[in-house]
Amino acid sequence: MNDIIRIGTRKSALALIQTQLVADELRQVCPGIQVEIVTKDTLGDRILDKPLQEFGGKGVFVSEFEQAIQEGVIDLAVHSAKDLPMELAEGLTIAAVSGREDPRDVLVTMRGHKIRPESVVRIGTSSPRRQLQAGLMCKTLWPGAAGTECSTLRGNVHTRLRKLEEGNFDCIILAAAGLKRLGLLEQDTYEYTFLNPEEFIPAGGQGLMAVEAKAGTMAHSLTQAMDHAHGRLCLELERRVLKLLDAGCHEPIGIYSVPDNGQLEVWGISSRRGEVKRIHMTGGTSREDMEKLALEAWKGLM
């Protein structure tokens, strides 16, 4: 096969690693295919001094790649699934979903750093979901602390770690999947506290990669061979719940699911109108059962 598949991705080290994983798998399922990686900075990469919810939400990492697919500049785009907006651009589809890397959030501190009794813990995170749960778990995570203070933290993983090193925060919260893919968990500069995803609930799609394509194209057809059934199952349920909730990145909502013996187990958290709600439920994996489960989750989180 002499076809060239052009894959679009952001320029960050993590985005490039994730895209290389997709490119390598595509070469395995389509021997002889040529792959070209096309990089660009998105609006979300260029504006780092504001929370995402102030200038466009999740779509700021995706929309420029969607336009490039529609215009034929690239054939595929690789995204962290949690960055996908609820509505894809016209004619585009999620052609493949990866298997799930570690879905947990991680508290990262400088090695040896201690929280003083009765002090306020300075946390670097722009995520309302992480801010909510860090506050709720303050006494568990930092016994003796007076409370938490969360401040905006944007940029790629290395930028965020540098700001931690500069003393701007007592800790920052990052996704385990990104730290693992970047090989940063081997560094002894930091201490890592992995948070149980059944208690500190991840974002919908966290730990998953999604490959976007124009529906009906050769690239779409080829990429479908890479689709991971369990990853697809979880992403579809989690995105369905988020869509029912009409949730954007400005709302503190976590949703996480795990396939187990033909069932889907799901955990969720939300805070609306000042009331925190949690769910934990199980349902089947047929289309009908998944819709029923999503509706039950929605009702529990509203």
Predicted regions and their residues:
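Short glycine-rich anion-binding loops that position phosphate/pyrophosphate groups of nucleotides
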Residues: 81-84, 177-179
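Short active-site-adjacent helix-start/loop capping segments
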Residues: 44-49, 77, 85-88
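Short, structured active-site "lid" loops
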Residues: 49-76
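Short, Asp-centered acidic motifs that coordinate Mg2+ and/or phosphate
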Residues: 74-78, 170-171
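Small-molecule-sensing regulatory modules
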Residues: 2-41, 46-47, 54, 62, ...
